[in-house]
Curated annotation (Swiss-Prot):
<dbReference type="InterPro" id="IPR036291">
    <property type="entry name" value="NAD(P)-bd_dom_sf"/>
</dbReference>
<keyword id="KW-0963">Cytoplasm</keyword>
<dbReference type="GO" id="GO:0046294">
    <property type="term" value="P:formaldehyde catabolic process"/>
</dbReference>
<feature type="binding site">
    <location>
        <begin position="298"/>
        <end position="300"/>
    </location>
    <ligand>
        <name>NAD(+)</name>
    </ligand>
</feature>
<dbReference type="GO" id="GO:0008270">
    <property type="term" value="F:zinc ion binding"/>
</dbReference>
<dbReference type="GO" id="GO:0005829">
    <property type="term" value="C:cytosol"/>
</dbReference>
<dbReference type="GO" id="GO:0004022">
    <property type="term" value="F:alcohol dehydrogenase (NAD+) activity"/>
</dbReference>
<dbReference type="InterPro" id="IPR013149">
    <property type="entry name" value="ADH-like_C"/>
</dbReference>
<feature type="binding site">
    <location>
        <position position="374"/>
    </location>
    <ligand>
        <name>NAD(+)</name>
    </ligand>
</feature>
<comment type="subunit">
    <text>Homodimer.</text>
</comment>
<feature type="binding site">
    <location>
        <position position="113"/>
    </location>
    <ligand>
        <name>Zn(2+) 2</name>
    </ligand>
</feature>
<keyword id="KW-0479">Metal-binding</keyword>
<feature type="binding site">
    <location>
        <begin position="205"/>
        <end position="210"/>
    </location>
    <ligand>
        <name>NAD(+)</name>
    </ligand>
</feature>
<comment type="similarity">
    <text>Belongs to the zinc-containing alcohol dehydrogenase family. Class-II subfamily.</text>
</comment>
<dbReference type="InterPro" id="IPR011032">
    <property type="entry name" value="GroES-like_sf"/>
</dbReference>
<dbReference type="InterPro" id="IPR013154">
    <property type="entry name" value="ADH-like_N"/>
</dbReference>
<dbReference type="Pfam" id="PF00107">
    <property type="entry name" value="ADH_zinc_N"/>
</dbReference>
Length: 379
């Protein structure tokens, strides 16, 4: 008695209301339709973007919703027309689709797809499948998808263009982090900023994304990597991953960007903002050297009005770049998994807690209290 073509009943964490704990519920997961895949999630990381959507300050959220966008699992069944994966394959769901047909997918300049970011905020897109319906039901009510993934469910349904097939021997409890946090930070340094050997770098924010950016800077051969965070407890981990200096803005007697400029004789070659917020964005620009300083922005801060910048700061030679998912896509993610298996980088260092899925609210509390970098939930 297989499950193919049948509704599956399983456990999922549902956000019914903003500002309230998630609720573990039994949900019904419909079979995949054309060009859809039903995936059994084995492990999922908890990312700050998941908490943004249930913050009362967030505008436009679709509720109730099953969150989670950093997961890994095994294909349970496929719908008609699916050719890129088959039942039994290990996969990482990706919140950026890769249709391979649109002008974005065909361009070497971006990892975007026309199916992604059609509006102003990707966090509230892909909330339904292509036919504008959900595959989740709970207590007779339709439940929204999140980012096209909804990894906080034992089973989920995603579009075939939102999947990367990975090696059969991949450790799902670690490579799930490649679904967002690690790839976003590491790629911001490697792919977007294009950090060069011998360069100086500043990384703002030492969560999972920021620490991954430090790993990227180190891999690229940076000679000096300055890590900045208001939580000094994160400095030991940052140094273990490659940071040469650590600064806490709250412990300085002048703006952190001024300190960085003094430390580096005029500013860093590459500045990467993994925290977000107008103050951090301004510091990112100000700490970059004139002439060629590169500023890459990754972090998002809720309800922040963003950066106000003078043309003078730009005509002095600085460049500003934005990045999403570190420039990776469904074709390049499998290479990241292979690089992890071959020891090119250490995903283990990012995992501070491993908890059973039903402890998800405990994991959220650890994140809010700044006590975790990445918590991996095991299903």
């Amino acid at each position: 008695m297989g499950t193919k073509g049948k509704v599956i009943k399983c456990k999922a964490a549902i956000a019914w209301e903003a500002g309230k704990p998630l609720s573990i519920e039994e949900v019904e997961v419909a079979p995949p339709k054309a060009h859809e895949v039903r995936v059994q999630i084995n492990a999922a990381g908890l990312c700050r973007s998941d908490t943004h959507v249930i913050n009362p300050k967030f505008e436009g959220a679709f509720l109730p919703v099953i969150l989670g966008h950093e997961g890994a699992g095994i294909v349970e069944s496929v719908g008609p027309g699916v050719t890129n994966v088959k039942p039994g394959d290990k996969v990482i769901p990706l919140y950026i689709p890769h249709c391979k047909k649109c002008k974005f997918c065909l361009s070497p300049l971006t990892n975007f797809c026309e199916k992604f970011c059609k509006g102003k905020n990707p966090l509230i897109e892909q909330e339904l499948m292509e036919d504008k319906t959900s595959r989740f039901t709970c207590k007779g009510k339709s439940i929204y998808h999140f980012f096209g993934i909804s990894a906080f469910s034992q089973y989920t349904v995603v579009k075939d263009v939102n999947l990367a097939k990975i090696d059969d021997d991949a450790n799902l409890e670690r490579v799930c982090l490649i679904g967002c946090g690690f790839s976003t930070g590491y790629g911001a340094a490697i792919n977007t900023a294009k950090v060069t050997p011998g360069s100086t770098c500043a990384v703002f924010g030492l969560g999972g994304v920021g620490l991954s950016a430090i790993m990227g800077c180190k891999t690229a051969g940076a000679s000096r990597i300055i890590a900045i965070d208001i939580n000094s407890d994160k400095f030991a981990k940052a140094k273990a991953l490659g940071a040469t200096d650590c600064l806490n803005p709250r412990e300085l007697n002048k703006p952190v960007q001024d300190v960085i400029v003094e430390m580096t004789n005029g500013g860093v070659d590459f500045a990467i903002d993994c925290a977000g917020g107008s103050e951090v964005m301004k510091a990112t620009v100000d700490c970059a050297t004139v002439g060629w300083g590169s500023c890459t922005f990754v972090g998002v801060n809720l309800a922040d009005k963003g950066l106000t910048i003078s043309p003078i700061e730009l005509i002095l030679g600085r460049t500003l770049k934005g990045t999403n998912f570190g420039g990776w896509d469904a074709e390049t993610v499998p290479k990241l998994v292979s690089d992890y298996k071959n020891g090119k980088f250490d995903l283990d260092a990012l995992v501070t807690h491993t908890l059973p899925f039903d402890k998800i609210n405990e994991a959220l509390n650890l994140l809010d209290q700044g006590k975790s970098i990445r918590t991996v939930l095991i299903f």
